[in-house]
Amino acid sequence: MSDSPILIIGAGISGLVLAQYLQRHNVAFKIFDRDSAIDARSGGWGLTLHWSLPALRELLPEHLVTRFPETFVNKEASARGDTGRFQFFDLRSGDALYNIPAAERIRVSRARLRQLLTTDIDVQWNKNLQSIESTADKITAHFQDGTSSTGRLLVACDGARSRTREILYPDVQMNQLPVQLLGASTLYSAEELGGVESIDPFIFQGSHPESNVFLFFSFLDTPNNFENSSKDRYHCQIIISWADSKEIPVPDANAERIALMNKLTDNWSEPFRSLVHKLPGDVEVRSIRIEDWMFRLGREHAHPRAVLMGDSAHTMTMFRGEGANNAIVDVLDLVTRVDMCQPSSFDSGALLSSLAAYENDVFTRAEPSFLNSRQACLDAHDFSKIEGSPLVGSRELKKSD
């Protein structure tokens, strides 16, 4: 059984980091993803990596660590040691109310980070998990294309809409939060930004004290950042959100969504108002219903050699940027508890004990992040609650005892 592979379901951040660790230590594995290719999905998101950076450096081979700058949304700012202020603004007055401190953090393109993490990794694409079959010492993943793969451990890294989680816990439902979000990404020139690039090289956020409509702004790329970057324009992500209590339905038509964004932000101060009002008429506006979910300790399932990791274990709101950081440390916790290089680690009794310890580590660390992220989401849409909220609090690693 020592040659039996680790099965990784999902080639997101945690799945690829785990794959890199296993490859570095010559441990057999297979990694599968439901997408047709790494760039199958359009649209860009940025990730802020802070308290997970030591774990990430420990897990990855040095030659990938040295290539981190290939993922930066603003290499120039990062090179000069600028970690950003991550300010929170009163969108009526334009005043900066809070800075979010961090000893160390980098802002990366999720797409570029995934590209880096696939280096020398053979991802099997177009693999939609259909079912799982278990015996005492093996676990088999069956895919919709009729193929299957058997291993000694299955690690579910298949995200917020985890098929693995559905199989393990068929009665579980995501928690819908009373918040609606509209988001778009576009290219703006420095002139169109109106000085926004001087506020922060990475991200900022804010809310209007009367309407309680929230703004999240981030740079996804900057001029001349990479060879394929725009020479004179900034790639920007613009998100606005509001509470369901405002009873504002989201229209289906894209043009009507842009019109709604303009209406909701019409009383914002500059330059924040123009960030929304200058959106091109043909930009795609995505509607997202905010949801979260957190696994519970001690919940039994039929597949003891399967374990959840990353968003499949703890789907968090985006309002503290802690999901990816927890996912990375999940990997370190797993390989700390399960000695992947030692065949006896996969004996049934030893593995069950190690996975229970891993789940306890994850729950102890991630539950506070999960709860803080939920509270930050709710507070973002009630200006009176922002003072002292996790929305503007520091981000730090909670270590297990």
Please identify what each model-predicted range represents.
Residues 87, 91-105, 109, 183-283:
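Conserved FAD/dinucleotide-binding core of flavoprotein oxidoreductases
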Residues 8-28, 32, 155-156, 182, ...:
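Conserved mid-domain beta->alpha element of the FAD-binding
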Residues 41-45, 249-252, 319-322:
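Short, solvent-exposed loop/turn segments at secondary-structure boundaries
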Residues 18, 374-401:
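C-terminal helix/juxtamembrane-tail motif
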Residues 36-55:
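Conserved N-terminal glycine-rich FAD pyrophosphate-binding loop of Rossmann-like flavoproteins
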